[in-house]
Regions:
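Hydrophobic membrane-embedded segments
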Residues: 1-125, 142, 160-167
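Transmembrane-cytosolic junction motif
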Residues: 32, 36, 128-149, 233-240
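Short helix/loop segments within enzyme catalytic domains
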Residues: 55, 145-147, 152-164, 210-211, ...
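Auxiliary, metal-adjacent structural segments of Zn-dependent hydrolase domains
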Residues: 132-178
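Active-site scaffold of zinc-dependent metalloenzymes
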Residues: 175-199
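Active-site recognition of the HExxH zinc-binding catalytic motif
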Residues: 196, 200-213, 220, 248-249
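A Zn2+-metalloprotease active-site environment signal
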Residues: 211-241
């Protein structure tokens, strides 16, 4: 556990050196760098934060061997003044050895062990709060949701045009105000009650599924759990999620006519 904690801390520290300029200059990057390029940058950083692989060299390039020292204690000869049969107590040959009584009287716990336990507690707490909150929200949103067969048929046509092989169930819910896709393994498209089915809405939400954006967000969440102590990682997660929406918008509008682009732009403005 201590080795894992130290590796996580080292990865968090090294990634922070890259995150600081990226996050501070986020506005400049958004204006001068394509969203898809930033998508790759955030993905690489998230993978590095989550995948705990030691990238150090198997053998250091330069090794310096510390010199070894031996301490020889002079032998003590029996004194003529000592009575016959008396034994002379020889000093311990191990330099720095402590008495067993002193070692058992004081029990020390390494600082790394305490920090490792604190880190593990934070990981479990973050997973419990966020993961449990997600499960409760999913249950609440789906509890009163009802199927919409007409919208599901339209979503099936849109999914086929996007190349999705699996149909996505569509539900109506009074608990949502904007359309959303819920679920990573078994996704469900939730639409607000009473809202008309819009083609651009279906394209936007189903494009998220085609791009595997839910898995991308799950990776960001895992990075936040492992590095809960690093505010830069949480900041990175928000920045990457915002950039993810821009990438999705670019894919939806790519190759569309002016009417579709105008309608999609109006949708983005209405939901901003």
């Amino acid at each position: 556990m201590e080795a894992l904690f130290l590796r996580v801390g080292w990865i968090s520290l090294t990634c922070s050196a890259v995150l600081v300029p990226l996050l501070v200059g986020k506005g400049w990057l958004r204006r001068h760098v394509r969203a898809k390029a930033l998508y790759v940058v955030w993905l690489i950083l998230a993978l590095r934060l989550v995948v705990q692989v030691d990238l150090s060299l198997p053998e250091p390039a330069v090794t310096v061997e510390a010199p070894s020292y031996q301490v020889a204690l002079p032998a003590r000869t029996p004194s003529a003044n000592l009575p016959a049969g008396a034994q002379i107590e020889e000093p311990s040959a191990v330099v720095g050895q402590t008495a067993p009584e002193a070692a058992s009287a004081v029990r020390t716990i390494p600082v790394t062990a305490l920090l490792s336990a604190l880190w593990l507690f934070g990981v479990l707490a973050a997973a419990l709060v966020q993961g449990g909150g997600y499960l409760l929200a999913r249950r609440r949103l789906l509890r009163d949701a009802r199927p919409d067969l007409e919208a599901e048929a339209q979503a099936g046509q849109t999914a086929a045009s996007l190349g999705l092989k699996r149909a996505v169930p569509v539900r109506r819910s009074r608990q949502v105000r904007t359309p959303m896709v819920l679920g990573l393994i078994r996704p469900v498209l939730l639409l607000p009650e009473g809202q008309a089915v819009d083609e651009v809405v279906l394209y936007h939400e189903l494009t998220h599924l085609k791009r595997l954006d839910l898995a991308y967000k799950a990776l960001l969440v895992a990075a936040c759990w492992l590095h809960w102590f690093n505010p830069l990682v949480w900041w990175m997660s928000r920045a990457a999620s915002e950039n993810l929406e821009l990438c999705c918008d670019d894919d939806v509008a790519a190759g569309r006519d002016a009417a579709f682009r105008r309608k999609y732009g109006e949708l983005l403005l209405s939901t901003a």
